């Protein structure tokens, strides 16, 4: 079996975001890009599955839809342990576009397991994995916190309200993973970093697919208003603030 892990290139959470072009795009100047944390955990679990030879996993490939600026993030994934990588040479316009590109690669390369992080830390869309399964007409399982193989079939644990659910689906399938899929992300060793330099990154031009969404405007959240504390023994002050300042009564 072959595993494909979808990875995103996202701004580090300490980055101060600025907008450009009339607040319709993000100013990428000075941004520190990192591997999306959810995808890093997904990759870690994929490598753990491959390490257990009883699972019959022949290879773990990572795929990214984006420009060449994502190369360092792709190389990090290779250093962590992925066997090879695929980069679709296009800007990731929206989830529909990204999913359509990945689905086309899966059709051609015949991957058995497609793993996605439950969301990216920049847009928090949680849409790509489900869309990939719909494009391909294969099962998808969301909120996966555990995955293993028994007799060649996947057995997945997913979080539900009030407990956990154990499900199994036929191969091929999409697993949309979340917290718990791996204890912690695998760290790239020096040997892995050196080997990553020579691992293949296959460059693919995008297939024709138009995004379904258009960004109208970005804006930062409003600053939090100051909080005023009123002594419990002074209800008159509370009433005055509600009437004359907050104007809610």
Language model features with spans:
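N-terminal glycine-rich FAD/FM-binding segment characteristic of electron-transfer flavoproteins
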Residues: 1-249
């Amino acid at each position: 079996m072959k595993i494909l892990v979808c990875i995103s290139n996202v701004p580090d959470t300490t980055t101060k975001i600025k907008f450009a072009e009339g607040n319709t795009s993000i100013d990428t100047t000075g941004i520190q890009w990192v591997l999306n944390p959810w995808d890093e955990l997904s990759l870690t679990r994929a490598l753990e599955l491959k390490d257990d030879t009883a699972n019959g996993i022949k290879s773990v490939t990572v795929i990214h839809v984006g420009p060449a600026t994502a190369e360092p993030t792709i190389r990090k994934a290779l250093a962590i342990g992925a066997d090879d990588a695929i980069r679709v040479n296009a800007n990731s316009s929206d989830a529909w576009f990204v999913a359509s590109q990945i689905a086309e690669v899966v059709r051609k390369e015949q991957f058995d397991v497609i793993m996605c992080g439950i969301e990216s830390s920049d847009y928090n869309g949680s849409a790509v994995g489900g869309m990939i399964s719909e494009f391909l007409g294969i099962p998808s399982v969301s909120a996966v916190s555990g995955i293993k193989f028994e007799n060649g079939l996947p057995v997945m644990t997913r979080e539900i309200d009030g407990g956990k659910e154990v499900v199994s689906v036929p191969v091929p399938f999409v697993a949309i993973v979340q917290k718990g899929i791996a204890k912690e992300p695998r760290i790239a060793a020096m040997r892995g970093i050196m080997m990553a330099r020579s691992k293949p990154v296959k460059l693919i031009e995008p297939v024709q697919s138009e995004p379904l969404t258009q960004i109208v405007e970005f804006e930062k959240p409003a600053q939090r208003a100051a909080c005023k504390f009123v002594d419990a023994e002074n209800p008159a002050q509370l009433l005055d603030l509600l009437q004359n300042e907050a104007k809610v009564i």
